Design a protein with these regions (language model features):
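Ser/Thr-rich, low-complexity intrinsically disordered terminal regions
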Residues: 20-186
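Bacterial Sec-dependent N-terminal signal peptides
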Residues: 1-23
Length: 186
């Protein structure tokens, strides 16, 4: 009886671990605000508003320069309101194996608003250019491809093609948030 109970507990804990691996890509992880996909995160810090803005501005100048991005343009760098916004285009690599490079160009807009409590990062206006080498490739927006309605089948399972774009976009945003968090906690 005791061994059976231990085996059941072990199986349940393993199953729970597997279930949590895809959790950050599940339904609800790509919010749509006013018809646009908008990923948003707030990072809290003990730094002042001006100090946070200065650190993030320096980080952004380095992060959004070549060769890390294809092209970027700062649309607003407002030191008085402590707001930074830019557009960027870079590659998201899905697979990089011998003779196989599966990637897409992602074009997005980022706004970073610094407050006394921390910084809010928003990523929106996301567009993709997939397989650009093949007859011009495919161009589409995040609203057409990675929203809950487009990325999941009727049974609630993440579709293969939409899934890789959804995972790549969420991972890119999470990477930006992690980098900003590291800058603010140094």
């Amino acid at each position: 009886m005791r061994r059976t109970l231990m085996a059941i507990c072990l199986c349940l804990s393993i199953a729970m671990g597997w279930a949590q691996t895809e959790g950050r890509y599940d339904k609800g992880s790509v919010p749509v605000v006013n018809g646009r996909v908008m990923l948003q995160e707030t990072i809290y810090t003990t730094l002042g508003q001006a100090e946070s803005y200065d650190r993030i501005s320096q980080w952004a100048q380095q992060r959004f320069s070549k060769p890390k991005v294809i092209v970027s343009k700062f649309t607003s760098n407002d030191a008085t309101n402590h707001t930074l916004s830019l557009t960027a285009e870079e590659y998201v690599v899905f697979a990089n194996r011998f003779f196989v490079l599966d990637r897409t160009r992602i074009n997005y807009w980022v706004e970073i608003q610094c407050t006394e409590q921390g910084a809010t990062i928003k990523m929106t206006r996301i567009n993709y250019w997939y397989e650009e080498e093949r007859e011009g490739g495919l161009k589409f927006s995040a609203e057409e491809f990675i929203t809950d309605d487009a990325a999941f089948n009727k049974k609630g399972k993440l579709l293969k093609d939409q899934g890789k774009f959804r995972r790549g976009t969420i991972d890119l945003f999470d990477n930006l948030v992690e980098e900003i968090n590291n800058v603010l906690t140094q």
